[in-house]
Amino acid sequence: MNYSMIFYIIGWILDVEAALLVPSLAVSLIYHESCALAFFITIVLCLIPGVILVRKQPKNKVFYAREGSVTVALSWIVMSIMGSIPFLLSGSITNPVDALFETVSGFTTTGASILPAVEPLQHGILFWRSFTHWIGGMGVLVFLLCLLPLTGSGYHMNLMKAESPGPSVTKLVPKVQSTAKILYGLYLFLTVLEFILLLVGRMPVFDSLCTVFGTAGTGGFGIKNDSFGSYSTYLQGVVTVFMILFGINFNVYFLFYMKKPKEALRCEEARWYLGIIATSILVITFFVRDFFDSLFLAFHHVAFQVASIITTTGFATVDFNLWPTIPKTILVLLMFIGACAGSTGGGIKVSRVVLLFRSLTKELSQNLHPNQVRKIHFEGRAVDHVVLRSVNVFMAAYILIFAISVLLIGIDNFDLVTNFTAVAATLNNIGPGLELVGPAQNFGLFSNFSKLILTFDMLAGRLELFPLLLLFYRGTWKRF
């Protein structure tokens, strides 16, 4: 294990986090708020160890897959702990476990909150709370790859593999560092475009910024107690469209950028993703049409909610907890499916779900025709058995973590639907669940123990399980 490289990168993470805290400090100063001191102290606390750890580059720059996984997992934990300090020092949240839960929920773009009301919070805290979504959406290690002038064996690719969502990582161009820059360029472009369209709809600048951060990162922290219900249909429509856009694999946008529209439109995962969204909207609208004054309003709010859930954003315009059983069941299924691989969305990912179903049909076919040789195809290519194995192992680990989490938080004696959807909402990085953790509720009712379990789930879901699990695997720390 190359500990010197791991600590060196964590040092850079702390320095970057200090820089990313500056906009929140500026917002606090603009609004003359007392939380400015909390941000200043946190910046100093990040810089002291950060500067010490990066003073000297490691001599040994060999960086294998396990170093990549450990670095990513530890970086997210350290980043979350330091990011929780402004909540505590400002008095916005007094319980350290609650502060950690809220911060992890922000960075992992989950949007689950322990706060019963957010409108009393200071602007600086609200800004930081939403900004964590934007930081975590594309990944802070991916951002670091754009900046850090470090060369080493396997360094760039192993970091990117460990942090990027989906069953596999694709380099858009030969150099991984250039790929990271392209991804962030596309991310920034879509962010600015949505911001402009929100301003056109006369949304205040501060509200627009916080909304854009939540949409881009598919997070869901709002600055209103009713999430997004108080805004106009135009603004809700803009957010609906951009939630869907941020849930698409960024490789598709890169193909459009490279003037290869035919290749982009052939993306199978994106077609499945859009098809699932369209079908879900039509079916749910049929069942909830009597809940609204017109069919248009029913379609409008259902489209918003479907986009919010499948992309794991978590914004809400209505309390879907009050809808009939079938619409709620569809929304729960969408929680598990999630967005596309290579997007900022969470969940199992559309590509994995498609591969799982095709693996199932292949096995059924081979049971009928044992001598048949049949390959699984996806995106126009035969899928390598290594990818299929990784998908199957991922699902096994996912089910195990899910089941254990539901069992452990059962200690609080809440109903099964609450516990089940609380784990679904955190492990899939969505935010709201059903019943006591519905869109009009919060996670503050859970004990500290359960909050820590759900915090683990949020980190595990964002990091695709394995980087976090490897921290607890004895073989990770062995010297070979």
Task: Enumerate the language-model features and the residues they cover.
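Membrane-proximal intracellular helices of multi-pass ion channels
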Residues: M1-F480
